[in-house]
From Swiss-Prot:
Family: Belongs to the universal ribosomal protein uL3 family.
UniProt cross-references to PANTHER family, sorted A to Z: 50S RIBOSOMAL PROTEIN L3 (PTHR11229), LARGE RIBOSOMAL SUBUNIT PROTEIN UL3C (PTHR11229:SF16)
Gene responsible for this protein: rplC
Protein name in the entry: Large ribosomal subunit protein uL3
Lineage: Bacteria, Bacillati, Mycoplasmatota, Mollicutes, Acholeplasmatales
S-S bonds: none
Protein's organism: Aster yellows witches'-broom phytoplasma (strain AYWB)
Length: 221
């Protein structure tokens, strides 16, 4: 079943599992998710549910978006994403009306999820740090230590060439993370391991696409 919800990364902590092992977890706040739009194949060419999360002020919202939020009878949202799923896949999101609140009971403890977020920006970095390339020789007479090497043709550079530049601040997805605990009163997910981005960063939590085998699940745990 395809499910999805938006949240904000609170931080990391540690909890004990049933076996008495200390496990690192990430706390994600998933409160106040609102359905903004239901898209279907006939009108939009694909099926998806548009979700909004985290209120923002009206003066920072454009008039077209204010009208969009007014149709959903909700306050303007800062973080908006679409949860896509094919028409033959069962999803509780498709049954919700526009303006409905999405509760945390879409997921259960033990579910595997894919978490998507924006990684931390690390500024300008060279090829060695950014792409894990090897350095040049450092013996006497060598003048090639940390350079990126040949960039290809004289005019322009090859597409996809690994060069120095802005490191981080990219969309990253970590797959098959387990939900260890759900706080229904405070709308918090405790997800095993780390998720992309800094604290207070927005993330999208979706049902895992790739199913793990028993051997892979045992190795992951």
């Amino acid at each position: 079943m395809a499910q999805g919800i938006l949240g904000k990364k609170i931080g990391m902590t540690q909890v004990f599992n049933e076996q008495g092992e200390l496990v690192p977890v990430t706390i994600v706040d998933v409160a106040a998710n609102v359905v903004l739009q239901q898209k279907n194949v006939d009108q939009d060419g694909y099926q998806a549910t548009q979700i909004g999360f985290c209120d923002k002020r009206e003066k920072n919202t454009s008039k077209p978006m204010l009208g969009h939020f007014k149709k959903a009878t909700t306050a303007p949202k800062r973080f908006i994403k679409e949860i896509n799923f094919s028409s033959d896949v069962n999803s509780n999101l498709a049954n919700l009306v526009v303006g409905a609140l999405i509760t945390n009971d879409l997921f259960q403890v033990g579910d595997l999820v894919d978490v998507t977020g924006t990684s931390k920006g690390k500024g300008f970095a060279g090829s060695i740090k950014r792409h894990n390339q090897s350095r040049g020789p450092e013996s006497h007479g060598s003048r090639y230590h940390r350079r990126p090497g040949s960039m290809g043709p004289i005019k322009g550079k090859l597409k996809g060439k690994k060069l120095p530049g802005h490191m981080g601040y990219e969309t990253v997805t970590i797959q098959n993370l387990a939900i260890l605990s759900i706080d229904t009163e405070k709308n918090l997910f405790l997800i095993k391991g780390n998720v992309p981005g800094p604290n207070k960063g927005f993330v999208m939590i979706k049902s895992a696409v790739k199913k793990l085998t028993k051997e892979q699940t045992h190795a992951k745990n």
